[in-house]
């Protein structure tokens, strides 16, 4: 919680949206569960990509309105389809979310994912592990018998399964 900028992230893609005029607004979180995912708007022109799917051209003339959650694409071609690929923070651990929704857990605090590759998070985890070992004189060896990986679970705006891959590591 102390470092929300170090929460695990994933790339998402908006729906295909057809332009009806020379400006198009795409609600990027439409059909995604807002309790699970939050767009990472830091340096979005570097990490996000807008594509004219009719021509496969990458579009650079766009802005993001954080208040409305819309990407505004300028100089669009009417009747061309466009998408936005964007980074989003995984603000609710997918496995915890799945269990909470499936089992109707009420009042359950949302567990967050964290990315141990990030410097502050890595330090936190290593310090906690060191402390665990130092406080236990009877422990000589710590054996990891399970390696944690994240299933890919994306839910829609109604908290239903949108995309689920129980066998992959794409959210790790």
Placement of each model-derived feature along the sequence:
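Glycan-processing catalytic domains of CAZymes
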Residues: 1-172
């Amino acid at each position: 919680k102390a470092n929300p900028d170090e929460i695990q992230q994933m790339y998402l893609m908006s729906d295909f949206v057809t332009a009806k005029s020379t400006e198009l607004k795409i609600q990027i979180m439409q059909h995604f569960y807002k309790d699970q995912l939050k767009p990472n708007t830091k340096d979005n022109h570097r990490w996000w990509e807008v594509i004219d799917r009719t021509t496969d051209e990458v579009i650079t003339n766009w802005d993001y309105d954080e208040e409305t959650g819309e990407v505004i694409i300028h100089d669009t071609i009417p009747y061309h389809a466009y998408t936005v690929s964007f980074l989003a923070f995984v603000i609710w651990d997918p496995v915890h979310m799945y269990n909470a929704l499936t089992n109707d857990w009420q009042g359950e605090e949302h567990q967050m994912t964290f990315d141990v590759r990030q410097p502050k998070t890595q330090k936190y985890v290593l310090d906690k592990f060191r402390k665990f070992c130092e406080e236990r004189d009877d422990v000589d060896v710590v054996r990891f018998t399970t390696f944690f990986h994240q299933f890919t679970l994306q839910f829609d705006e109604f908290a239903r399964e949108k995309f689920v891959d129980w066998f992959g590591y794409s959210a790790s």
